[in-house]
Amino acid sequence: MTTTHPALTAGRPAGYVPRLKQYYREHVVPALREQFGYRNVMQVPTLVKVVVNMGVGEAARDAKLIEGAVRDIAAITGQRPAIARARKSIAQFKLRAGMAIGAYATVRGDRMWEFLDRMLTLALPRIRDFRGLSPKQFDGHGNYTFGLTEQVMFHEVDQDKLDRFRGMDITVVTTARTDDEGRALLRHLGFPFREN
């Protein structure tokens, strides 16, 4: 029997299931089984993790800039991000191996479902002139990566304490074997893909 740490379940009622996860179980799984003809429920693609990455190239010149990225990702994802460091020294960019050049957080479990729910229902609709996500940014194995130009569309980021606008990359890792399966999964979950 596994137990979860009390700090992770604080403020949640017993038996709590995130809204998007519940929707996945009740609506998306039957729809995908019908669409692709899966015989077993375990064959249906699901979400594994979401990686939020914020590259801060200017941190090579000013080390304090990385703190803003760490603060923003922590507010958006609800967990402390890891610092990405340079692997090689590149003289043209005034970069030395080991310098902090970005921050990233890997979100799994219920936090992942809650993050995606907030992103799809609150953050993406706040983007000005938003025409939808590109349906072509799959990696060949059902995983989807897209970029956002600024972090202010998330309600968790305090706009008064914002030092600068930072873009971010978000990767959604799935168990889908093909891009078509991954695209169908994300479309059923509510990802607003553009029609070509």
From Swiss-Prot:
Reply yes or no: does the keyword Transferase apply: no
User: Which cellular components does GO assign to this protein?
Assistant: ribonucleoprotein complex; ribosome
Please provide the record's keywords in A-Z order.
Answer: Ribonucleoprotein, Ribosomal protein, RNA-binding, rRNA-binding, tRNA-binding
In terms of InterPro entries, this protein maps to: Ribosomal_uL5 (IPR002132), Ribosomal_uL5_bac-type (IPR020930), Ribosomal_uL5_C (IPR031309), Ribosomal_uL5_dom_sf (IPR022803), Ribosomal_uL5_N (IPR031310)
A GO BP term here is: translation
Q: Which Pfam families does the record associate with it?
A: Ribosomal_L5, Ribosomal_L5_C
Q: Look up the domain of life of the source.
A: Bacteria
Record GO terms (molecular function): rRNA binding; structural constituent of ribosome; tRNA binding
- Quote the function comment for this protein: This is one of the proteins that bind and probably mediate the attachment of the 5S RNA into the large ribosomal subunit, where it forms part of the central protuberance. In the 70S ribosome it contacts protein S13 of the 30S subunit (bridge B1b), connecting the 2 subunits; this bridge is implicated in subunit movement. Contacts the P site tRNA; the 5S rRNA and some of its associated proteins might help stabilize positioning of ribosome-bound tRNAs.
| Binding partners and assembly | Part of the 50S ribosomal subunit; part of the 5S rRNA/L5/L18/L25 subcomplex. Contacts the 5S rRNA and the P site tRNA. Forms a bridge to the 30S subunit in the 70S ribosome.
Report the protein name in the record: Large ribosomal subunit protein uL5
